Amino acid sequence: MPEGPEIRRAADNLEAAIKGKPLTDVWFAFPQLKTYQSQLIGQHVTHVETRGKALLTHFSNDLTLYSHNQLYGVWRVVDTGEESQTTRVLRVKLQTADKTILLYSASDIEMLTPEQLTTHPFLQRVGPDVLDPNLTPEVVKERLLSPRFRNRQFAGLLLDQAFLAGLGNYLRVEILWQVGLTGNHKAKDLNAAQLDALAHALLDIPRFSYATRGQVDENKHHGALFRFKVFHRDGELCERCGGIIEKTTLSSRPFYWCPGCQH
């Protein structure tokens, strides 16, 4: 599943394609959304926001399209009039004079009013987004030490969107390698230096992954230039200590780590 950096890059692509342009055609697959088709003609997308792995497309009439891709959903940008070559099932079409954005295969799609946006169950449940530039290491440290999270093992905590939105398995793996910790640690057991390093890594690594999107290399995760240190590198040498990277399972997800320098 794409993680926060990949979702944010997708949002950037959607914004670049249609932001500020009048919508000339709107289509929704789900019957409960069809009533909004005529309401959106002539309106425009003001911005596309991410909350972890959810995407919020905001319109000029104050409506917001909520979508969560889950495992299978994908957004695509095409020239208006062009057919997208795919066997996926189309769920949403937002068309402007020159560009059209298409959402395929997703099932978690809703239209929200401003009031509903503030009370949506998923949006209320998720924690601060790691790509939010206003989120600081100090705030992350406070969350790590809060009664709600301080006794949680990192193996599960770093996958919990209620802790920090936008983290996922590859980020969990890379963050813990960066700070030299295994997944069985808890925030309450760390010393001040470890806690500080973890708080910074929880923001620095997702933001670096997002920022290095300039070129595409299909051999790297979701086309990002972000280079894995341990993820999917089991059996290879650790570049930090020369140990052999191993693969195991933590919180029902594959976990990659170096026994030589992660303790």
From Swiss-Prot:
Protein encoded by which gene: nei
GO function terms (MF aspect): class I DNA-(apurinic or apyrimidinic site) endonuclease activity; damaged DNA binding; oxidized pyrimidine nucleobase lesion DNA N-glycosylase activity; zinc ion binding
Binding-site list for DNA: 70, 125, 169
Catalysed transformations (reactions): 2'-deoxyribonucleotide-(2'-deoxyribose 5'-phosphate)-2'-deoxyribonucleotide-DNA = a 3'-end 2'-deoxyribonucleotide-(2,3-dehydro-2,3-deoxyribose 5'-phosphate)-DNA + a 5'-end 5'-phospho-2'-deoxyribonucleoside-DNA + H(+)
Stated family: Belongs to the FPG family.
Protein name (database record): Endonuclease 8
Species name: Escherichia coli O157:H7
Record carries keyword Lyase: yes
Stored InterPro entries: DNA_glyclase/AP_lyase_DNA-bd (IPR015886), DNA_glyclase_Znf_dom_DNA_BS (IPR015887), EcNei-like_N (IPR044091), Endonuclease-VIII (IPR023713), FPG_cat (IPR012319), MutM-like_N-ter (IPR035937), Ribosomal_uS13-like_H2TH (IPR010979), Znf_DNA_glyclase/AP_lyase (IPR000214)
Known function: Involved in base excision repair of DNA damaged by oxidation or by mutagenic agents. Acts as a DNA glycosylase that recognizes and removes damaged bases. Has a preference for oxidized pyrimidines, such as thymine glycol, 5,6-dihydrouracil and 5,6-dihydrothymine. Has AP (apurinic/apyrimidinic) lyase activity and introduces nicks in the DNA strand. Cleaves the DNA backbone by beta-delta elimination to generate a single-strand break at the site of the removed base with both 3'- and 5'-phosphates.
Zn finger intervals (FPG-type): 229-263
Alphabetic keyword roster: DNA damage, DNA repair, DNA-binding, Glycosidase, Hydrolase, Lyase, Metal-binding, Multifunctional enzyme, Zinc, Zinc-finger
Active site residues of this protein: 2-3, 53, 253
Lineage start: Bacteria, Pseudomonadati, Pseudomonadota, Gammaproteobacteria, Enterobacterales
Domain of life: Bacteria
Cofactor note: Binds 1 zinc ion per subunit.
EC number: 3.2.2.-, 4.2.99.18
